[in-house]
Curated annotation (Swiss-Prot):
PANTHER family, sorted: TETRATRICOPEPTIDE REPEAT PROTEIN 39 FAMILY MEMBER, TETRATRICOPEPTIDE REPEAT PROTEIN 39C
Residues that span the membrane, as ranges: none
Tagged with keyword Cytoplasm: yes
Protein's name according to its UniProt entry: IML2-like protein YKR018C
Native source organism of the sequence: Saccharomyces cerevisiae (strain ATCC 204508 / S288c)
Amino acid sequence: MFKVFGFGAKEEIPELSQEEKTKAILKQAHDFEQALRAMDYVLDDNADEGLALLDESDAKEASDQTINALARGVIEFLEATLGFEAEEMKKASATLAKAEALSLKSRERAQKIGLKSSSLYPPGTVYAVTYTESCLLHALLMIFSESMMEAAKAILKLRKSYYMLQEILETIKAANKAKKLKITSGSEDKESTPATFITGGDAFNSVDIPYELTPEEQKDKDLLQFAEQIHSMRTERLSGAHIGNSPAINRLRGELGLQAMEDLPEEEITDHKVLSDDIDLSQATIDEFVHSGVNLCFGILQVVISLLPPAIGAVLSVVGFRGSREEGLRLVWKATKQRNVHGCIGLLALMFYYDGPFQFTDDDFDIPAAVKDSSNSEDSEDEEMDGPTLLHPGKILEDALLQSRALFPNSALWLLNEARMLSGKGRLEEAVALMDSIDVSKIRMRQVKSLMIFDRAITLIHLHQYDRAAEDILSLLDISDWSHAFYTYFAGCCYLENWRMCEMGLMKSDKKDEYQKKAEELIFTSVNLLGKKTFKSKNLPLDRFILRKVEQFKAKKEELGVENPLDGIATSPVHEIAYFYNGYNRMSEEHLELTKKMLTEYRNPAIEALDSDQELIKDLLVSLTLRRLGHIQEGCDILDEKVLPKFFSIQNGKVKYIKKTEDPWAYPTALYERALFTWKLEGMDGLPESKEWLLRAQGYADDYELSTRVGMKIKAAIDRVDHSL
């Protein structure tokens, strides 16, 4: 009956009657709903059930192989990007390539037979969206591979995706305008009127069929039953009833943290209800997929392009790429309002942007965003989130996350993001307590389990709880195939700091000798693991960082002739790791004071040697600690007098850089932080000078380890200044 989307047939596609088209349209909507349900299972930590649903659908005659392939590709993409493991990335790439090819075939067939499955858009539009989505995700995996050949292919894919997304977005805007005009004029279009079934005197409207039915179709019981089934599938998905969980409304909180869970009302509601007023219950499945897919893909694409360093950005602009961070964020926010996988991926992207370890919206660079004048906007919907709200979404982001926590109670991924949000607000103890509330051994998705343990370890070092942080990190050696070298080095740095705290009398422990032994063993053997258990063909940026650090430690030990290898380590390396993961913005005053004490009062032969490069790292970190403690001028003076002169000067009005290689990440970072000092000291009046410092940071152009991380942070800060000047 529904052989329209069968693949492999060479014969010419015959013309279809309206009845055949109606059946094909309903089958398409059904298969898309089935795929959306499968992907939601994965977001609730039940990938096996989701994949089983797709297998079941694949086995049926004339199922929509295109959406099934994309759904499988999205699942594998999530697994690959959460864990960055070679085999997972390879598998996801192959599936997404298949989805690309199937999308083009399906689009062509839908256009040939005139299959109008949307009341707004021309035939085949939904497959243009599946194509761009699979293309974009595939391109991102190619970029992550760090192969020059794959990166070149990725640019071509991104270009195709970019232009098709622009085309679809314009179609959406035009359709929305036409719809508003029809509503205003009161005119009706039979081609966009939902189908009505009549049975036993009752009427049922199906929004999935965008035209009037023939008298025979209106009385077709099989057709009616199928349309009602799709309506039921959609209603259950929108309320969260489709994946076997109890009503989400009973888990919906108004605040973050464990205490808010305990404060939930005891009386339970038995009916499933939608959690947001933004959800449109009358929207057809295909239209919903088109809207959310385009908003998500074009939004993420624009944000990523806007954050790329100037050198890459200039190349992309030549081939037609333009990225607007604000417009991109608005589109991603729009996607989050849809109760489907696009909304969830959009929320994960926003959580990474606002509360991830890199925090592109730096807490210390709290410039108020300029409010954009939207009075002359052609599309008021595009302006519903103004600049200040985009910069600091606050409660809006919290509520979006809490909805996902309620909808997906079995998934540690959403709990992890809540913990990250708590950590971003400086509520570190609460973040650890929340992560401790779940048994990590019961997390099914291995990549999420690894992330949970890693994030907890990072949070623990911000709390100076190094023993437990080291245990967590070392446990990842048996779980994750990411960088075993970094895990080992990280744990060694934790034990080193514990040993130093024992030496300073800040910590009483009978394990002091054990800490010393473990620190020495783990730090200096970590480099032996480089190139092993890593997802790329070459070492990760953090791996290259480790190699350089350990070589420095060994060289200093030989230079000083000390017996204890730990005496060859000056500035405690765990504080560098804390900076990379935004620790200084998250520590309480108590922990900042302890950090300052450890950086300034511990003594050993390497520190007393006053090595210029080691002093630079120490002074940079001390200056940031002072700024967070409120001693802004004192911190700025240290940066100006002890850090910047070692690699930067202004001669005859021109900037001069002294190229150094000892700690490459530190030099552009110091210039970036100097911009933040100017902002803290001078406010809005200092923004022009802040921008000068940021441009100098950007101008320290070099391909150094962590350059992508530092470069994107600098670029985001420049954009913020530009919007406020």
